[in-house]
């Protein structure tokens, strides 16, 4: 991109929010963008990404199926994956994404008296935002508040992984109302934080 190559195609799998940010960035840089979504993503979320110039591809199945299809087609077509989920040999972009999430914690700290924070409640998903916020708490706060990580009972990949001490895959049989939280496996990068900080 920095050399003026506008033929780059970026791709990601999403339930909505991450895909919107990738579509926005691609449009800003003049790149083509392919967004893979599961059949459970609402038409409104898909349209929001289309409105940003992305080509949205609906995949039969859940989020994990859309991620598998994204990786497959990206490999076949030489597209650049911009994913917030880490796996073996794909860690850099998810680390940058998590670093961006820590800005939210810094903004919170800058706006309130940090001694007044007693509890922080975080969504789990694949663990990226939760792991980043926990790292931000450790970095920016003197007094560590009680931190609660929540996830749907039908997609409790963080809780099940914490129980066994290793990443567990959840076969999601029932989608959550919060589609973006319906994730079956913890991302490798945040797992290194979550396994040592969540009970």
What are these regions (language model features)?
Residues 1-37, 116-129:
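A short, small-residue-rich loop immediately preceding and capping a beta-strand
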Residues 21, 25, 48, 111, ...:
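Rossmann-fold NAD(P)-dependent oxidoreductase module
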Residues 24-34, 135-144, 166-168:
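A glycine- and small-aliphatic-rich helix-loop capping segment at beta-alpha/alpha-beta transitions
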Residues 31-48, 140-154:
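Short, acidic/small-residue loops that bind anionic groups at enzyme active sites
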Residues 34-119, 162, 166-199:
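Small/polar-residue-rich loop-to-helix segments that shape phosphate-bearing ligand pockets
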Residues 86-89, 124-128, 151-156, 177, ...:
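Glycine-rich beta-alpha junction loops
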Residues 107, 128-132, 137:
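Conserved PLP-enzyme active-site core in the AAT-like
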Residues 129-131, 155-159, 180, 190:
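Short acidic/glycine-rich loop or secondary-structure boundary segments that cap or lie
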């Amino acid at each position: 991109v920095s050399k003026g190559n506008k033929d780059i195609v970026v791709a990601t799998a999403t339930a909505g929010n991450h895909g919107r940010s990738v579509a926005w960035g691609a449009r800003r840089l003049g790149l083509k963008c392919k967004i893979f979504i599961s059949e459970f993503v609402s038409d409104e979320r898909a349209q929001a990404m289309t409105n940003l110039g992305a080509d949205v591809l609906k995949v039969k199945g859940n989020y994990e199926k859309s991620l598998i299809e994204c990786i497959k087609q990206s490999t076949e077509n030489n597209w650049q994956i911009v994913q917030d989920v880490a796996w073996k040999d794909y860690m850099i972009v998810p680390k940058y994404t998590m670093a961006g999430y820590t800005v939210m914690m810094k903004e919170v700290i800058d706006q309130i008296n940090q001694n007044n924070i007693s509890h922080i409640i975080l969504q789990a998903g694949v663990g990226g935002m939760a792991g980043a916020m926990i790292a931000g708490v450790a970095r920016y706060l003197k007094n560590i508040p009680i931190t609660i990580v929540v996830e749907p009972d039908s997609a409790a990949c963080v809780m099940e992984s914490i129980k066994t001490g290793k990443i567990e895959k959840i076969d999601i049989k029932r989608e959550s109302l919060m589609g973006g939280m319906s994730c079956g496996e913890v991302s490798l990068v945040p797992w290194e934080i979550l396994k040592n900080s969540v009970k």
